[in-house]
């Protein structure tokens, strides 16, 4: 099972509870997901299931299916993620409105699995003819939270992650001063496993864990 740390923080507690009560003889290994395209690791069986935000992959699979091409992977929506801008308490931008100009003028940290300093936030800014200055990239959401609490950098994190990661008291959350596309978190798997009873159980367990997590996540 491959997923990023922010996704795992939300899903794994519920999944562990399901394992304990319903399948105590089952073992699951969670691998770090360091790509927005997990198809190679699913194809070579490095992972049986991936959970995360895969916009380009899902768009490609949908396009292939629409023109009648073979599609070797299946997917299922888990939840819609909301993202917020976060900064440390006492940050110069922590009081007062976070305007688009202030956001773009600040120094930013970006969570990037590839290390590329350009993500979906930057795509949204570019569509408005704007850009921000990314001075640091890391590949884990937990690391991003720790860095921001000890610096004047801004970062953009999943709202649910800030709420459950114990950083709520150390970070100030602000709504983004621009619109971003909906972030659809989904599971992805190779079609050869579609009818495997064990894999069907795993997919259902992950989906249930997601539903439980968002029912229990306190509002921001």
Segments (PLM) and residue ranges:
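A late-sequence structural motif
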Residues: 11, 84, 94, 100, ...
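Residues at or immediately flanking beta-strands
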Residues: 25-29, 133-135, 172, 184-186
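Hydrophobic hinge/microswitch elements
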Residues: 34-38, 43-47, 53, 113-172
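Beta-alpha-beta core module
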Residues: 61, 68-82, 142-191
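Central regulatory/effector-binding core of bacterial HTH transcription factors
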Residues: 1-61, 138
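Flexible hinge/capping segments at coil-to-helix
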Residues: 65-108, 190-192
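Secondary-structure junction motif
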Residues: 53, 60, 87, 93-100, ...
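Short, well-ordered beta-strand segments
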Residues: 1-2, 50, 86, 109, ...
